[in-house]
Amino acid sequence: NWFWSGGCIVNETASETLKKINSQVNIIPKNLDLTYENIEVVGKPNVILACTDNMESRFLLNDYALKNNIPFVYGVSVSDKGYILNVAKGRTCLRCIFKSSTEETCDTIGVLNSNTTTIASIMANETIKIILGAGYEKDLIRIDFWKNEFSKIKVSQNPKCPACLGK
């Protein structure tokens, strides 16, 4: 079932579905709380996608991707808003833009169903462009689903950003 697997772990369900689509793909689902102590489990993929539900994990993936020179696609869906940012060495990262891990979450305010599928589609498209070496989006993409507003926000790298400086 593509859309609902009640009681199942999402990453395992996604892995099974993707393997049905392409049996040649190598997917190793992991169900764990990502921390600075176990971040190496991510390995050295061609690209990292952050589909996590909290900013702390997103910052962790951001830092790991920059440290290891791995392109990183950030996407978030909460309430009726969605954001996507491609992070790579020498470009704006999450820590350049967001200063704190305090935020509204799907647990606290919910999420509009159409939001998640649209954000995931754009993230998939950006990932394909990265893998193919095509030009990919440099701006922060912001979508307000309630107002039907799609916008690109110019973002700048913070010259004092600890993640960008490798600290």
Residue map of PLM features:
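Adenine nucleotide-associated cytosolic modules
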Residues: 1-167
